[in-house]
Amino acid sequence: LFLGITFNYGLILGWTSVTNQINVIPILLYVGAIFWTLGYDTIYGYQDIKDDEIIGLKSTSIKFKENPKTFLKVCYLIFFTILLSVGILMKLNFIYYIFLLMVILHLYNFQIKRLNIEKQLSCLNIFKSNNLLGLIIFIGLIIGKQNF
């Protein structure tokens, strides 16, 4: 949670520096990104969960190791719902929603369904895929603002 709160604060800073104002949209994006980060950081944590347990670390990977996919579904559903809300509030065009479809398909089909917390490489590959996912969201937001 702390990583998501600190890491994603740049959303609000970037938004305000470009628009010179603050409104509900960057705050929604910030909250959504926190839940996205909670998800992918939990996946990342499964790579070395045994070491974390030995040293007594308190992490979402340890807390939800018995049912990680349920936790990820909740995090990613909140993230997706916020992205959907942002699209509506910003009056983005239909192409944004096509990009959102790619986002939810990736989160569910690639990340949640394929996750095997017993295999480090599975966790690493899924974690790294979030880089591409961020690009898809960014492009969707840019194209979604265009008038066709």
Question: Which stretches of residues belong to each language-model region?
Answer:
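Multi-pass alpha-helical membrane architecture of UbiA-family
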Residues: 1-148
